[in-house]
Structures are given as C-alpha cells and as structure tokens.
C-alpha cells in the first residue's frame, strides 16, 4: 500500500489518490462524530473524553444503578445497590394508587364499620309484639314439643298469621328462657348455694 501511495504521489503530486493512507486518515475525523466507534481510553484526547459524557444522562434511565454509571459511582452502597433507587418508581406511582384504594376504604369499610352495622342490628332487633291468641298457641305447642320441625312451624305460622322465621325465633328464645328458669329452680333447691351469699352480705 505504501508503494501504491508513493506511485500515486509520483504520478500526480498535486492531487493525492483517493485510496491513499493520507486521504483515508484525513477523512476519518469527519466521520467520527456520526459513527463514534468505541476506542480505547488511552488513544482519546481530553476533548474527546468530555464529549460522550454530555449525552450519557439523557440516554439511560435514571431508575437503576445498572443503566446509569453516574448513579453507581456517586451513590452510597445503600443507594447504588437498589433500595433507594428502586423505590423511585413506587414513590412516583404512590400518588396515583391511593386514590382508588382510599375511595373504597372510605366508602365501604369505614361507613359499614360505624354506621352500617348500627342500622342493620336495629332492624334485626325489631321485636314482634305477639297477641294473646298467638302466645297461647305458641305456648301450647311448646309444651308438646320444644323443637318443632319446619312443617309444624309453618302450619302454626299460617294459623296465627305470622311468618315462620318469627315462630322459629320465638321457640329459640323460649327454650333459652326455659333453660334459665330450670337453672334458677335447681339453684333454689340447693340450700348451700343460697346461704353463702346471704351470710356474706
């Protein structure tokens, strides 16, 4: 190639050959800014070292230390390892996430916890006022059977003009009252249990 270059220079000393080494080397600086091939650090000038640092922060993402070399060198071991930098995305999304979550919390659990169960319990605690005829029919069946089946309760409910659910609840309450009365009567029969509270008073 040196011989070809020297032959070309001998032929036309005023105009260099387009394929000569001098022509190729002179055209390389014009193409370097466009292509920017990787070169060793030792071969670069101080001006060339400063040029790639300007576009570096814009090209990589700033969320992790793997993409951003400046974050790895600048940050402490805690921030460069990830906990501080990885939380950048959740912290950015934090204002958007509480809005849908706070709406149901304020609507359903808070309101149902304070005002919701109150009215529901009051509606469930609505007491039915039984007439004398209804109470007599219920007591008569209770004497015969303390645990009537569904069919018996339905027939009684139709006869006394009540719902079967009310009849079932009445029998549950009546059985609880009967057990309480039975315990009270059994405690009265035992003299030791009654004397001890009187003596203590």
Curated annotation (Swiss-Prot):
Top-level taxonomic group: Eukaryota
DNA-binding feature ranges: 123-182
Cross-referenced SMART domains: HOX
Any one GO molecular function term: DNA binding
Any single biological process term in GO: regulation of transcription by RNA polymerase II
Keyword rRNA-binding: no
Region annotation Disordered: where it falls in the sequence: 1-55, 95-124, 179-201
Gene Ontology CC entries for this record: nucleus
Keywords, ordered alphabetically: DNA-binding, Homeobox, Nucleus
Cell location: Nucleus
Compositionally biased tracts (Low complexity): 95-106
InterPro entries xref list: Goosecoid-like_HB (IPR051440), HD (IPR001356), Homeobox_CS (IPR017970), Homeodomain-like_sf (IPR009057)
Tissue: Expressed in adult testis.
Major subcellular location class: nucleus
Protein family membership: Belongs to the paired homeobox family. Bicoid subfamily.
Function: May have a role in development. May regulate its own transcription. May bind the bicoid consensus sequence TAATCC.
Protein name: Homeobox protein goosecoid-2
Record gene name: Gsc2
């Amino acid at each position: 190639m040196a011989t070809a270059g020297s032959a070309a220079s001998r032929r036309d000393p005023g105009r260099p050959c387009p394929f000569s080494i001098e022509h190729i080397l002179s055209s390389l600086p014009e193409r370097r800014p466009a292509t920017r091939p990787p070169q060793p650090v030792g071969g670069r000038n101080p001006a060339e070292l400063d040029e790639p640092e300007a576009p570096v922060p814009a090209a990589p993402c700033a969320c992790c230390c793997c993409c951003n070399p400046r974050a790895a060198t600048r940050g402490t071991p805690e921030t460069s390892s990830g906990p501080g930098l990885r939380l950048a995305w959740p912290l950015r999304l934090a204002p958007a996430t509480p809005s849908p979550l706070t709406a149901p919390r304020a609507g359903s659990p808070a309101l149902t916890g304070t005002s919701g169960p109150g009215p529901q319990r009051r509606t469930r605690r609505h007491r039915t006022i039984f007439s004398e005829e209804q109470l007599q029919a219920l007591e008569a069946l209770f004497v015969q059977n303390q645990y009537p089946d569904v069919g018996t309760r339905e027939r009684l409910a139709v006869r006394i003009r009540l719902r079967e659910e009310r009849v079932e609840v009445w029998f549950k309450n009546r059985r609880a009252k009967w057990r309480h009365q039975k315990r009270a009567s059994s405690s009265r029969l035992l003299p030791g249990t009654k004397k001890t509270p009187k003596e203590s008073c």
